[in-house]
């Protein structure tokens, strides 16, 4: 298995710290709002990476934190007029609603900053004792110039960093490059007692303390979005290795940005999309499929056309799965109309291609392509054989489930895909469906075939297939 390591700037063969086990720490959200599409990409990417290690037979210890002590939380709580910890707890709960919708599995541990203040204070004390941090007016700062190798993750020199560094009003740090490990208490902000007075931790030290507590030094993989490379992850390395004298994490994995019609997603442009909003517009399976549709290190551009394509793609997968299950459930004698052995041979090739794609730095775009090749092979086989081999079909279904256990497109129970039951998919009510069918019939009678086709195609994208028969219009789920 090859993994691109941001630290070295190249692909490396993965070799775990402990044979047969993988330790992963992923920076989770700051809980001051609902998660947006950029947050979701990181969640889905690293959930998929974890799933693939499990598929390969590894035992995985997966940690994803919640930053529930932060300036953004304090500012948002003032706007809403509630306590910062109440606000943070609210958005932790909301995170799980969105994560569940995207079929993101729970981490083994979801540590919160507020529950780990003693560990944070102990780590800061170690850094001070090693001469790499200093106290100034109740604040504690990391002395960047005293740590050799600072900048090696982000590939930045101290001179480059100094050009963009600044000292905020009220800060007492000795060097513009230094960063806060502990911040003295201010009126109206949460605080904890410490050897340096009342205060709260800086952002970067929080993740170091939690990662070291649950995974120890030299753990396997540290992940997050590319926006965290500097300063967050650079500072994590400095303070963690400064405290322990040992390597912090061995492989650093960063997912690329989400763009909106090739523009950066930002509040100022008004193009920040919340997962909660998008899952009301599109099936969550389609959103997850979209988030895995490009290599994780590359930018991923969002637009409605791309999402509609993902909806159609998910429906193709559902149709194939339905045909497989229907064929296996049908009370018919087993047969082989001349293709079962060939299909089984193709399945082996497809499994090899899928694993090769994921082994090559978790290339989910290629892995998805293999999954769609599987649907093509199954559809072709069923079309060409009146008496298909049940053994071959069962192997195809098993492979479909195996691919899904990695990509996580559909929810699963005991390793098998679970599709939601119901007369009509999504938020489409029976009454609305009847109305759309009636409008399409009116359009056809008026020879407005463009409108009729648009309604038909729109319903197909929502998982409803219309059939025109002499007895009238019939519909079925795809």
UniProtKB/Swiss-Prot annotation:
Keywords: Aminoacyl-tRNA synthetase, ATP-binding, Cytoplasm, Ligase, Metal-binding, Nucleotide-binding, Protein biosynthesis, Zinc. It is an enzyme of class 6 (ligase). GO terms for molecular function: ATP binding; cysteine-tRNA ligase activity; zinc ion binding. One of its GO terms (cellular component) is cytosol. It is found in: Cytoplasm. One of its GO terms (biological process) is cysteinyl-tRNA aminoacylation. Binds 1 zinc ion per subunit. It comes from the Bacteria. A motif ('KMSKS' region) lies at residues 264-268. Zn(2+) binds at residues 27, 207, 232, 236. A motif ('HIGH' region) lies at residues 29-39. Pfam families: CysS_C (PF23493), DALR_2 (PF09190), tRNA-synt_1e (PF01406). Its EC number is 6.1.1.16. Its cofactor is Zn(2+). InterPro entries: Cys-tRNA-ligase, Cys-tRNA-synt_Ia_DALR, Cys-tRNA/MSH_ligase, CysS_C, Rossmann-like_a/b/a_fold, tRNA-synt_1_cat_dom, tRNAsynth_Ia_anticodon-bd. ATP binds at residue 267. It catalyses: tRNA(Cys) + L-cysteine + ATP = L-cysteinyl-tRNA(Cys) + AMP + diphosphate. PANTHER family: CYSTEINE--TRNA LIGASE, CYTOPLASMIC, CYSTEINYL-TRNA SYNTHETASE. HAMAP family: Cys_tRNA_synth. Belongs to the class-I aminoacyl-tRNA synthetase family. Monomer. This is Cysteine--tRNA ligase. It comes from Desulforudis audaxviator (strain MP104C).
């Amino acid at each position: 298995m090859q993994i691109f390591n941001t630290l070295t700037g190249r692909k490396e063969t993965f070799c775990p710290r402990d044979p047969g086990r993988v330790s992963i720490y992923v920076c989770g959200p700051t809980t001051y709002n609902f998660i947006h599409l950029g947050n979701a990409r990181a969640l889905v990417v690293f959930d998929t990476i974890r799933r693939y290690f499990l598929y390969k037979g590894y035992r995985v210890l997966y940690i994803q934190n919640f930053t529930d002590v932060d300036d953004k939380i304090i500012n948002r709580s003032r706007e809403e007029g509630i306590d910062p910890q109440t606000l943070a707890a609210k958005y932790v709960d909301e995170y799980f609603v969105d994560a569940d919708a995207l079929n993101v599995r729970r981490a083994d541990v979801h540590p919160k900053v507020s529950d780990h203040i003693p560990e944070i204070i102990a780590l800061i004390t170690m850094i001070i004792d090693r001469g790499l941090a200093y106290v100034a007016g109740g604040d504690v700062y990391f002395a960047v110039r005293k740590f050799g190798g600072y900048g090696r993750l982000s590939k930045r020199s101290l001179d480059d960093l100094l050009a963009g560094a600044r000292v905020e009003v009220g800060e007492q740090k000795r060097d513009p490059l230094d960063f806060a490990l502990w911040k003295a208490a201010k009126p109206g902000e949460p605080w904890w007692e410490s050897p340096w007075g009342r205060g709260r931790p800086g952002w970067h030290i929080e993740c170091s303390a939690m990662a070291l507590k649950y995974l120890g030094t030299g753990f396997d993989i540290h992940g997050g979005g590319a926006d965290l490379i500097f300063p967050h992850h650079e500072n994590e390395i400095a303070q963690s290795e400064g405290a322990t004298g040992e390597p912090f994490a061995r492989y650093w994995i960063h997912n690329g940005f989400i763009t909106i019609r090739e523009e950066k997603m930002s509040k100022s442009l008004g193009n920040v999309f919340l997962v909660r909003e998008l899952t009301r517009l599109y099936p969550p399976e389609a959103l997850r499929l979209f988030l895995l549709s490009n290599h994780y290190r590359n930018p991923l551009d969002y637009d409605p056309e791309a999402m509609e394509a993902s909806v159609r793609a998910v429906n193709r997968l559902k149709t194939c799965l339905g045909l497989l299950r229907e064929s296996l459930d049908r009370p018919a004698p087993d047969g082989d109309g001349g293709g079962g052995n060939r299909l089984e041979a193709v399945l082996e090739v497809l499994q090899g291609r899928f694993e090769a794609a994921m082994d090559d730095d978790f290339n989910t775009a290629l892995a998805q392509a293999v999954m769609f090749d599987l649907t093509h092979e199954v559809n072709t086989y069923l079309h060409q054989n009146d008496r298909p081999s049940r053994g071959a079909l069962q192997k195809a279904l098993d492979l479909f489930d195996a691919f899904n256990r990695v990509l996580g497109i559909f929810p699963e129970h005991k390793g098998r895909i679970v599709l939601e039951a119901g007369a009509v998919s999504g938020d489409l009510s029976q009454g609305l469906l009847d109305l759309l069918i009636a409008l399409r019939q009116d359009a056809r009678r008026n020879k407005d075939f463009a409108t009729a086709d648009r309604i038909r195609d729109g319903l197909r994208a929502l998982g409803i297939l219309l059939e025109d028969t002499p007895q009238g219009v019939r519909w079925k789920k795809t």
